[in-house]
Amino acid sequence: MPHSIPLLRPNPADPVPSYRLPHLIHTYSHLPTRAISHDDASMAYYSLAPIGCNLTEGFERRIEREDEEEHLDGLVESLEWLITRGRKGERKGGIITWRGMLTRLITMPYETRDPWEMTAIALDGSVYLELWDPPEEKAKRKREQSAWEKQGYMGYAYESFSTIPQEGRPGNGPEGWGGDVNTNVQWANVVRSAIGEIPLCIAGEVDCVKAEPGSPNPGLSGCMELKTNKVIQHPGHEAMFHKKLLKHWAQSWLLGIPEVVVGFRDDDGILRSQTTFDTAKIPYLVEVLNKPSWSPNRCLQSLHSVCSFLTKNVLPTDPLVTYPHIRGNRQAVKEAGELPPAVVWRLAFDPKKGCELHAVGEVGVVDGRWGGMLKEEYVRWRMGLE
């Protein structure tokens, strides 16, 4: 097994792979306790935020979720929930991951500052992909973010002013306030898609839906993404915003969210204006500029290139391929005394060097997680041992 495999950068002249329209297969909610409920309990309804509202509202009352590593738990639990009820889960031969991982892959051609690493393992015909976030990196990021804590909070406050929760708005808040921020609460969509011939199964948080409060889930066509940005005051601000539109487009496009609403705030956190963007049209807004800062074609080529790279190298190391007798064979596992190990891979990106993949080695069950990633009981279920 090669120690390290470099990823060749895609040729811009190559054909542009298509991105299949996402198909919603499941939704689930994180409740205020962070527990998962396989329903729309945490789905919120869009309501236009009042201009002039203060996006520092409720900062001292906020509840932030514990900084615990959840890996791919919500996504894989959803797949098990679907399949054990006779419904379709992922399509084999592709990648199962969070929307945030694919956002990094699709925007890679234009990332000039931040390196990252991801962990990949193969199981039951799919590559599972998550962020490699060692404790020292997490601590460093937390220190850096603490200086911008209030600015980061403004995005959550904008969501509160822009949404009506299932239980309705509290009666004691300012106009439009949807309730104090609790970052435990999330509503997530799970979709099937594909980049070219490579199947994708993706989960990601969705901010709200455009529907009457109290009405049922309208599906992907009613989903909306909410963002904040500083008021644009000069060409430099505008250029920065066009670059930010790349990430806004990628996040929404990957999950099939048709609209992005951006609230523009001043330095004091006061909402000054709002603009709604059609996700599919965002690339055209950038394309008409004299010097467009990004192209969706290069993004799609990048996503396909990395996904193809991963499936080609990681899928053959699936233990159900290398140890086919294990599937459903409880006796063999009992005699071995343990599950066959996962082959753990690391996908590393550096803006100056590009992307490379290397095998970390075989890792069994560590602290209840196979390969350090997937819960042991989920892996046993996938292997037909439950």
From Swiss-Prot:
Substrate binds at R34, E205, K227, Q251. Its cofactor is a divalent metal cation. GO terms for biological process: mRNA processing; NAD-cap decapping; nuclear-transcribed mRNA catabolic process. It catalyses: a 5'-end NAD(+)-phospho-ribonucleoside in mRNA + H2O = a 5'-end phospho-ribonucleoside in mRNA + NAD(+) + H(+); a 5'-end (N(7)-methyl 5'-triphosphoguanosine)-ribonucleoside-ribonucleotide in mRNA + H2O = a (N(7)-methyl 5'-triphosphoguanosine)-nucleoside + a 5'-end phospho-ribonucleoside in mRNA + H(+); a 5'-end triphospho-ribonucleoside in mRNA + H2O = a 5'-end phospho-ribonucleoside in mRNA + diphosphate + H(+). Its main location: nucleus. GO terms for molecular function: metal ion binding; mRNA 5'-diphosphatase activity; nuclease activity; nucleotide binding; RNA binding; RNA NAD+-cap (NAD+-forming) hydrolase activity. Disulfide bonds: none annotated. Belongs to the DXO/Dom3Z family. PANTHER family: DECAPPING AND EXORIBONUCLEASE PROTEIN (PTHR12395:SF9), DOM-3 RELATED (PTHR12395). This is Decapping nuclease RAI1. It comes from Cryptococcus neoformans var. neoformans serotype D (strain B-3501A) (Filobasidiella neoformans). The lineage of its organism: Eukaryota, Fungi, Dikarya, Basidiomycota, Agaricomycotina.
